[in-house]
Amino acid sequence: MSGGLDCLALKEDDVQKFLASGAHIGSSNLDYQMTQYVYKRKPDGTYIINLRRTWEKLLMAARIIVAIENPADVCVISSRPYGQRAVLKFGAHTGATPIAGRYTPGTFTNQIQAAFREPRILIVTDPRSDHQPVTEASYVNIPVIALCNTDSPLRYVDIAIPCNNKSIHSIGLMWWMLSREVLRLRGAISRDVTWEIMCDLYFFRDPEEAEKEEQEARDRATAVKEEPAQPYAEQWSDPVAVPPAGQPVAEVTDWAADSVKAPVAGIGTYGGPSEDWAVADAPAAPAAPTPAAPSQEFTATDDWGGAASNDWAISS
């Protein structure tokens, strides 16, 4: 398919991308029409796709897309979530019309609905999951290009690009290579220069993981922000010097310079406040002894209610 041209030959860098994304790994089932694209079968029953045939079909599909004058007449569809980001990026870079998500039945056949389209060529991610647009394309004679696995049905498929259409990285890489080859054939980018768009842009990203990464980035940015320096007083009794508005606060670089030593309290008995911290506290005067209370002597009497008396006739 490359016609012996070195510029169209499969490069080693592209082969490494194919192997890293797992584009050569098929499924454990094999459709009889996909037998020609199988290289060998692994001991565990998984089929290996011939990457040379994948590259040839990729070039053929790119040449067909470039032959269409209006890029908007190319319709790319992916109902599976793994290929929706890829078809949207493909449409943004090549000018094709993407349909990501649920396909509305009758888009190609029902002329009275608002979503009616008449594309000149249709490209689908999986002919099994996108069977509705493939079937409708056969009704109105629209050629179909599909990314096909070893077990994909080829009914109504005109050009099958053999690859792994189940892997996230494989789907993104195939759409990225197809868009790169289309732009090269149009002359938009040079073959001697590496395309500035990375294939990671075509990979599917989970919205929850993307939101988590954005939240972590915001948290890191918040932690990096430094708080502004606040004015301080050297003594507790000194007023705080507040700089005027608009003037930056001087930053303290050496906290050990001109530091004020705090007074150290004595170990002895506290003798009251002193104006001069350098003067030692005077020893406290000894306390005077407390006088003892006078002792009282009591005389035993027979009369418990009054004083002692010898005359019993006298009332107390």
Curated annotation (Swiss-Prot):
Protein name: Small ribosomal subunit protein uS2
Function as written in the Swiss-Prot or TrEMBL entry: Required for the assembly and/or stability of the 40S ribosomal subunit. Required for the processing of the 20S rRNA-precursor to mature 18S rRNA in a late step of the maturation of 40S ribosomal subunits.
Annotated region (Disordered), positions in chain: 209-240, 283-316
Coiled coil segments of this chain: none
Keywords assigned by UniProt, alphabetized: Cytoplasm, Ribonucleoprotein, Ribosomal protein
InterPro entries: Ribosomal_uS2, Ribosomal_uS2_C, Ribosomal_uS2_CS, Ribosomal_uS2_euk, Ribosomal_uS2_euk/arc, Ribosomal_uS2_flav_dom_sf
CC annotations in GO: cytosolic small ribosomal subunit
CDD domains: RPS2
Family assignment from sequence similarity: Belongs to the universal ribosomal protein uS2 family.
Oligomer status and interactors: Component of the small ribosomal subunit. Mature ribosomes consist of a small (40S) and a large (60S) subunit. The 40S subunit contains about 33 different proteins and 1 molecule of RNA (18S). The 60S subunit contains about 49 different proteins and 3 molecules of RNA (28S, 5.8S and 5S). Interacts with ribosomal protein S21.
Gene Ontology MF terms: structural constituent of ribosome
Principal subcellular localisation of the protein: cytoplasm
Signal peptide (from-to): none
The UniProt record lists the keyword Cell membrane: no
Biased composition (Basic and acidic residues): 215-228
Any Gene Ontology biological process: ribosomal small subunit assembly
